[in-house]
UniProtKB/Swiss-Prot annotation:
Keyword Lipoprotein appears in the UniProt entry: yes
Protein function: May play a synaptic role at the postsynaptic lipid rafts possibly through interaction with CAMK2A.
Post-translational modification: Palmitoylation and myristoylation target the protein to the lipid rafts.
UniProt key word Membrane: yes
Tissue specificity remark: At the mRNA level, predominantly expressed in the brain. At the protein level, mainly expressed in muscle tissues. In skeletal muscles, expressed in cranial and facial muscles, muscles of the neck, back, thoracic wall, and thigh. Also found in the contractile myoepithelial cell layer of salivary glands.
Species assigned in the record: Mus musculus (Mouse)
Protein name in the entry: Brain and acute leukemia cytoplasmic protein
Compartments reported by the entry: Cytoplasm; Synapse, Synaptosome; Membrane raft; Postsynaptic density
Length: 145
């Protein structure tokens, strides 16, 4: 054993001060795997092509030897390419539900803008009614009648 921290600390240092909910959600979003844990539990045998003890996700065992995903060299049919919203698809941009969803977002932004405008008007009205004082702390005549 060497002196100092563990190997995991050297590979992935922890920054407790900068960990926020935003970084947590980003980390959770980009570290999720395709296979669900419940699906792996039901198909978790060498015959079913599931993960074995000592086998990493990429098919390598913990000692670096390549292990087949399924018996006979057949690829696992459960493993699918799931690209979600990252795949560019021009046909989806003009579809009905997506356009409606965008219109809903635009309507929400318009409502927010209307609220912002009313807040600005209130602020303007309040500032117009403020009385001016001179240096001797006497209230001067209001400029607005």
């Amino acid at each position: 054993m060497g002196c100092g921290g563990s190997r995991a600390d050297a590979i992935e240092p922890r920054y407790y001060e900068s960990w926020t909910r935003e970084t947590e959600s980003t980390w959770l979003t980009y570290t999720d795997s395709d296979a669900l844990p419940s699906a792996a539990a039901t198909d978790s045998g060498p015959e079913a092509g599931g993960l074995h003890a000592g086998v990493l996700e990429d098919g390598l065992s913990s000692n670096g030897v390549l292990r087949p995903a399924a018996p006979g060299g057949i690829a696992n049919p459960e493993k699918k390419m799931n690209c979600g919203t990252q795949c560019p698809n021009s046909q989806n941009l003009s579809s009905g539900p997506l356009t409606q969803k965008q219109n809903g977002l635009w309507a929400t932004e318009a409502k927010r803008d209307a609220k912002r405008m009313s807040a600005r008007e209130v602020a303007i009205n309040v500032t117009e009614n403020i009385r001016q004082m001179d240096r001797s702390k006497r209230v001067t005549k209001n400029c607005i009648n």
